[in-house]
């Protein structure tokens, strides 16, 4: 009888990536098949996120529902992973003694051994350590699920922003070697992946080891990924302004595979609040990065993160944030009301902004961003956009759906053979959450490259020094 696994995932794209790796790992080692129905499962895993408010209570509410399933089936294994597991550890079992496994983001690769241990002597297992890069060394080969894929290139963060739990739950920055990343992406490309999204809590801080023992930069890695045959689009998330260096901006100038869309969190437009947040950059420095980016790639669109109602935020501070939003003309944002995370420095600050004021500021900010996003969408009306076709439309099974470079969903009439390929679509209608278009060119008519070697990418990104000597630093 087939053994079944149910994974419930909350949080960021890194958590989604981790959950997919858990599923692949337990399929390879134990033959577990994924199910969307918790009642069918032999193993239940909850991959948690500590970013949102009341994250811990949300976990225990979910575990309470699963407790009823365990009472009916004592052999059921329940595991809790992710960032809340890292924060709470043994405390989870103190409140929910029926939980069998507690593991952190850096120990998910040990799940097979943990399950074997529980199956063997029924003793619970808690492992929330930080074994650095070992996690990636023990994961199964990647498996493509459509034309887009996420690839984690690093873990953790060294920035210690005062509101953020990531350094405490995922540890400090650890970069994967470049060869491991490139091999994983090449495997995905061979399975039909056309677009790859490089993941990291602070992805542009990547400093991985190269094959020759040298340390590579994120800009180097982007160019090498662009050289992989079949990869026609590259995205990455999430970046930090302090490490968005000029060499990364140069990649936007000479590497068309890198999309004209960037998510670059800023959090606030007030230097005073940025200082309290420990962001180590100013609003002016952030805008300088955007100016350089738009000089290199004039059509680039920017999204960001914002926190409103941070302790001490005044009306003047908030107005500075609104000015930054107008100056940069953000295309979209992830915006939140501040809520303290236990164990962070901001949790000890006086939360002196009234709740109603926080809600009002969030509403004003989101309305402005929505207006700007709609204005960006309207500019696309009548233009031709290249779409990576992901599958059938959610709105109609008779239509296809895909995404533009700037992450807009486009629905259009097409044929099944277009799925997984690029099409050029003329935008005919603009809606608040999507666009509509008609196909004007198929991939066969585009003349996309058939193959390109790393050497050819290096050749076309060749620079010359003051003496006229060409160079490229891999």
Swiss-Prot record:
Catalytic activities: N(6)-dimethylallyladenosine(37) in tRNA + (sulfur carrier)-SH + AH2 + 2 S-adenosyl-L-methionine = 2-methylsulfanyl-N(6)-dimethylallyladenosine(37) in tRNA + (sulfur carrier)-H + 5'-deoxyadenosine + L-methionine + A + S-adenosyl-L-homocysteine + 2 H(+)
Keyword Iron-sulfur attached: yes
Amino-acid positions noted as binding [4Fe-4S] cluster 1 in the UniProt annotation, renumbered to this chain: 12, 49, 83
TRAM domain residues: 378-441
Listed EC numbers: 2.8.4.3
Gene Ontology CC: cytosol
Compartment(s): Cytoplasm
Main location: cytoplasm
Top-level enzyme category: transferase
Names of required cofactors: [4Fe-4S] cluster
Source species, domain of life: Bacteria
Residues that, per the record, bind [4Fe-4S] cluster 2: 157, 161, 164
UniProt record similarity statement: Belongs to the methylthiotransferase family. MiaB subfamily.
Record text on subunit structure and interactions: Monomer.
NCBIfam families: miaB-methiolase, MiaB/RimO family radical SAM methylthiotransferase
PANTHER family in alphabetical order: CDK5 REGULATORY SUBUNIT-ASSOCIATED PROTEIN 1, MITOCHONDRIAL TRNA METHYLTHIOTRANSFERASE CDK5RAP1
Summary of the function given for this chain in its UniProt record: Catalyzes the methylthiolation of N6-(dimethylallyl)adenosine (i(6)A), leading to the formation of 2-methylthio-N6-(dimethylallyl)adenosine (ms(2)i(6)A) at position 37 in tRNAs that read codons beginning with uridine.
Name by which UniProt lists this protein: tRNA-2-methylthio-N(6)-dimethylallyladenosine synthase
